[in-house]
Amino acid sequence: MNKIIVNGGKSLKGEVNINSAKNSVLPIIAASILSGDKCIIENAPMLEDVFVISEVLKSISSEVDIDRDNNKIIIDTSNICNSEPCSELVKKLRASFLIMGPMISRFGNFKISLPGGCNIGTRPIDLHLKGLNALGADINIGYGYVEAKADKLKGNKIYLDFPSVGATENLMMAAVLAEGDTIIQNAAEEPEIEDLAKFLNSMGANIVGAGTDTINIIGVKDLKGVVHKPIYDRIEAGTFMTAAAITRSKIKLNGVNEGHLRPIIAKLTEIGVKIDTNGDSMIVDGNHQLKPVDIKTMPYPGFPTDMQAQTMALLTSIEGTSIVTETIFENRFMHATEMKRMGSNIKIDGRSAVIEGGNELTGCEVKATDLRAGAALILCGLVARGSTNVTDVYHIDRGYANIEKKLQALGAEIYRI
């Protein structure tokens, strides 16, 4: 099954349930290493990335049981006896590098191949390594591997040159068992950072300030296993909000956190979409006169880079000129080439894309170049004339569970072959 076929022109209606956040679950799975005990993740999304990082943990002798029927993951890291995970697995998923902090903190040594993931630009690991070095780890890089050793990590003050989510998570996990106090300045503020801190604190860590630009961590001696339910996936929610907008439809989302979605809500509201939230549910009505806007991706609480491609898809359907500026990754406009094959008028100028919206799109074969690009091409297919064939859908499966089934339930004519 390597294609998703979308026959455009159908309006959407009904309800869709949003999964818990992939970008919370991946670091939480990594953090389970710190306890040496059993941790249970409830309401876990059944995604390819989740399966890969689970296999990474198995490759260092952890026990990981994935209960797909009940969306539960049970992790027992008490018998870890290998300090080098399978390199082929690590190369599949960039988030595999998140186990470095927990492994060094608990065991004092670790070796890992350079990580993989979506090809959306250079995402250097230097911030991770500089921070781990500041905590006392001796770092060596060579022949495609990173090796770290430390008798015992010691707390320190760390300033991140950029508020990297992965570096913030890795250093936070490394510091919880370090001796003394650690302060991470210019830390990432994403909701997933807060969720990881909540998980770690429930294990017995002492973390204050997660979700702000300064995180204080007082090291503790050990951590215990816990049960945790992650936050909702704000990017999946944003994708379905955009699906309602691009099809000029009205749908209900169940499983949202309005606070986490504020940047997306603000921009869609500016476009003309009507959004009403009640508790953890949201009504999104795109059946209004929509107008072009300018968007600039920024670290949270700015507009998320992970919603850039989907929003570009929406803007191609709105008459007028929009400008999208990508400030996080330098190579995240590959979907524009595929959208142009469908009839979109998009011009790339460095880190900006100029969209002359309103052209009718025509279905054709397009390639999902990365996770969010794949979702964006499906959105284009929902409104294109004729049939759109999206290939390389393994990218999409990394972050969306059964996206075609969820859209089918809303009335879209979409299927997988």
UniProtKB/Swiss-Prot annotation:
InterPro entries associated with the record: Enolpyruvate_Tfrase_dom, Enolpyruvate_Tfrase_sf, MurA_subfamily, RNA3'P_cycl/enolpyr_Trfase_a/b, UDP_GlcNAc_COvinyl_MurA
Main location: cytoplasm
Protein name in UniProt: UDP-N-acetylglucosamine 1-carboxyvinyltransferase 2
Similarity comment: Belongs to the EPSP synthase family. MurA subfamily.
Keywords: Cell cycle, Cell division, Cell shape, Cell wall biogenesis/degradation, Cytoplasm, Peptidoglycan synthesis, Pyruvate, Transferase
EC number(s) on file: 2.5.1.7
Modification type 2-(S-cysteinyl)pyruvic acid O-phosphothioketal: residues: C118
